[in-house]
Amino acid sequence: SIPYPKTVNLKSATDLESIDRLTFPLLIKPSTGKNLNVDVFRTLYFEAKEDYLKAKPNLAKKIEEGVQFVISEYIPGDDTNIYIYTCFRSQSCKILNEWDGKKLTQYPDHFGQFSSASNETSDVVLKQGRLLVDALDVYGIIETEFKYDDRDGQYKLMETTLRSSMPHRTGSISGVKLHETQFKYATHQPVRQYVQEKSQRIHFVPMIHEIPNLVARKGYWKHFKHNVWGADKRVWAIFEWRDMKPFCYSLYPFLKTIVKAVLVRLNFK
């Protein structure tokens, strides 16, 4: 009941016909750990079937040489369409606390880590996240990511991680202390149940990602402006008056990141 991008393994030339059940655009890449002595691309993107048909003879040749591929549906859209559901689930199969939100943008460019995050989300993400966690039947901290596909209006599963990822503080600043939940559960203390703040928009902003994006990505100003000033409440990552050490330690890597972003923008690196 949870939609996800379909994937096909291409192990023989006849498998090249199995893409008919996939929806374009598609991404194809060699399977991990296959014959590295063969000269082969890392990733190919097919916008339409015509593009795939042009590349098909070369793919068949590479398969004959021993290379296997994985081809997957690619969900179009930028990095503003990625949603998060995170929870802590007990060994008795009960979700003790949970929060959901979205990545406002990603860094670097449209991939990788989050650039800023928010408590803005959809009830569909909450429902699908709970269903997936129950189906996995694991315990501990679980995070799932969904990408909104505006072609059919569905939130499609992108990945599941059995740990907290970088935007985890988004949950804490919107009222859900998931790591406290984990600690108290592990130490057999009473666990308090939290309700996430949804009445106001809260943005979690690490400038160590936002500034390089602003420098390196053309047209990023509109996202920067929204991420920094577009919420009812903004929380800076790292920077806190009560404990300035993390901020001070981060200044050097922050400056290095800025210099690298400038070089990228000037095409020097």
Map each language-model feature to its residues.
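Active-site nucleotide/adenylate-binding loops and adjacent lid/helix of ATP-dependent enzymes
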Residues: 1-70, 91
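Flexible, glycine/charged-enriched surface loops at secondary-structure junctions
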Residues: 70, 139-143, 192-198
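Peripheral (often C-terminal) accessory segments that flank ATP-dependent C-N-forming ligase machineries
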Residues: 184-269
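Phosphate-binding site of ATP-dependent enzymes
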Residues: 13, 47-108, 120-130, 147-148, ...
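Conserved metal-phosphate-binding beta-hairpin within the catalytic cores
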Residues: 134-169
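Glycine-enriched catalytic-core subsegment of oxygenase/oxidase enzymes
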Residues: 173-180, 186
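Glycine-rich phosphate/pyrophosphate-binding beta-alpha loops
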Residues: 104-116, 161-175
